[in-house]
Design a protein with these regions (language model features):
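His/Asp/Glu-rich metal-coordinating catalytic cores
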Residues: 2-71, 76-178
Length: 178
């Protein structure tokens, strides 16, 4: 049986490796890029005078015509904290769950970005299509409600991005009530 070449999926970490915080990963397939999370990091002790560390998004700016939007796993600062700063440079839509979107909207309001950024609330079990990608939001347990893992489908295959999660034998699930 001949194996079909379905192209290559690039997974490009722009932060969050070998450090705590600043989680941001680009997934690229041909003419489409999606960005999962956009967090900040807090400065190390030797970084005097620095309040926040935000990711270098030069790759996204250089490929802006391919970038379809931000897909956010949950509302912790290391996953959403850099959004207002990055969105001032690259205006892209945000896709996430209801509680997480509420937290993000408060940040956008603080930075006078609420009216300029497109946003879409996605439910667990629902999928969205962005360019060459289909992204399914999967309910996961974490220390914040409404957290998601993501099944990212592309012509090259499927990647499951877990975001953050915790094993909890007595999880609190249900509607976030936002």
């Amino acid at each position: 049986m001949k194996k079909e070449n379905r192209g290559k999926l690039k997974i490009i970490p722009l932060g969050g490796l070998e450090q705590i915080g600043m989680n941001i990963t680009a997934f690229e397939y041909e003419d489409s890029i999606i960005v999962v999370d956009c967090g900040l990091a807090f400065p190390e002790d030797d970084m005097l005078g620095i309040d926040l560390v935000i990711p270098d998004v030069t790759y996204l700016k250089d490929n802006i015509s391919k970038v379809k939007g931000f897909v956010i796993t949950h509302g912790h600062e290391d996953h959403i904290g850099a959004l207002p700063y990055v969105l001032k440079e690259i205006n892209l839509p945000i896709y996430t769950t209801k509680l997480t979107m509420g937290i993000i909207e408060n940040k956008l309001k603080e930075h006078n970005l609420l009216r300029t950024i497109k946003r879409k609330v996605v439910r667990h079990g629902q999928s969205i299509n962005l360019g060459q990608f289909r992204i399914e939001f999967i309910k996961t347990n974490h220390s914040i409600q409404d957290a998601s893992a993501l099944a990212i489908y592309s012509p090259a295959g499927t990647v499951v991005h877990t975001g953050d999660f915790k094993v909890d034998y007595t999880p609190v699930f249900g509607d976030a009530g936002v």
